[in-house]
Amino acid sequence: MSGDPKIEATAVAKTKEDTNKVDIKAMRQFVEIKGGIENEIYNPENATTYFYREVRRSVPFIKVPEIIKPNGSVNFGGQCQFNIPRCGDYLLNLTLYIEIPKIELNITETAAVPGGAAASLHRVGWVKNLAHQLVKEIKLNIDDTTVVNIDTAFLDMWSEFMTDNGKFDGYKEMIGGSKELWDLDDKVAGAGTIILPLPLFFSRDSGLALPLSSLISSDISVEVLLRKWDEVLLLEDINNSKNKVIKADDIKDGEPKLTSIKLIGTYAVASKYEVNKTRCDDRRMLIEKPFKASEYELPVFDSGKLDEPIPINMEKINGAIKALFFAVKNTSRSNEHSVYKVGLPIPGTLRIDGGSLHALSEIGINLAEHVFVPSLPIEYYSYQQPYEHAKRIPNNRDLFMYSFCLDVGDVDPMGSINPKLLAKRLTFQIKPTKDLAEATKNKQTFKFITYALCNRLVSIRQGKFTLLSQSMYGEDGEDE
């Protein structure tokens, strides 16, 4: 075309001396050659150069940690409250540290083994992923409102789908996945420190950090409810390889006690300019709030089909649903709280009694009277959905998700569904496997659990933090 730039002959002509050199002048002219798409995406006006870095300026700030101790003494089975101090202008994250004591058995029964030696009949150890199973419930309270409420199963699901692959192995070590804690020993369950980063909304992005300098009239606290020691400790009888409930008399020093528990908060301290500006300004935040939407006890199956749809409780959900996390949880044992298989873990191993058996073969989702997701193989929810919309595909293939948004990891609005538009009717249609049907006949018990991850609007005004109600059209209603 006549309007296209021309490459001058002198620009590409080369002598014998420079045949191995790049002709910069010629290359620059090649860069200037543009077609339709280049004219669309490369525009000198308001364009960014990649070779002249513009600094995005910020007010000055510094990041500092602070140890937060609970009110009073705390032990297994107790509830501890942490009042969040104002050690900075913003709260970035909170991490729970729990020191676990050593457990030494008081049982002296032995049996002969090949070679003539005597071995203990019993072995003891902590459950795997101890932090998830020891922490029964976590609440973030601001004034009289519970802003976030999470439990063991949500911690299991969130970590599997939303922890970056590069951090996942380290995360498992932090929460008690190391063999030193869960490996069963003849006499001793090892001591150690378990570390649990709390997945609260303000840890998701620095732009959602909790603005303490603006919340001058609000009291902020975190409540942690712990399970009893005998709910997270395993005792195995070698004769029959069964997980037995341990008693205080079985332990040398009697009933065990926690060594210590604390939170470490990460704060940002900003300049006076920012503090003065944000303290005076009203603002709104779009936060994430998980809801426990169902805990449906599965019946004994006489066939491989569940005729009645599993309802999801939308009564307390007030917000736009980003994603659903769901699973069939095996509730057969009082001291195993993170089992999502048919069959039960063999203490001291990574194996499942009877093999790693799936509970479901297909899952469908209905919205109101309509099929929203047809009945699909479970791999759609454990592989394809997290591959497309989460940070990782879970190691545990019996944890499932369905995303209404494009990217669950992004805190910006990227799609959602309003449950009020559905007249609060959302159901799952599941197809149990034969293994699940047999297990229910053999007195294993299961629950279908669902969590809805929702967006909520928050108002920060006159020093107070308020969750806003939303109408079915997304307009702000009265404060809760």
UniProtKB/Swiss-Prot annotation:
Keyword Cell inner membrane: no
Encoding gene, per UniProt annotation: MCP-1
GO CC, one annotated term: viral capsid
Coiled coil: none
Subcellular location: Virion
Name of the protein in question: Major capsid protein
SUPFAM superfamilies to which the protein is assigned, alphabetical: Group II dsDNA viruses VP
Keyword Kinase: no
GO molecular function: structural molecule activity
Pfam family, one: Capsid_NCLDV
Keywords associated with the record: Capsid protein, Virion
Its job: Major protein of the capsid.
Species of origin: Trichoplusia ni ascovirus 2c
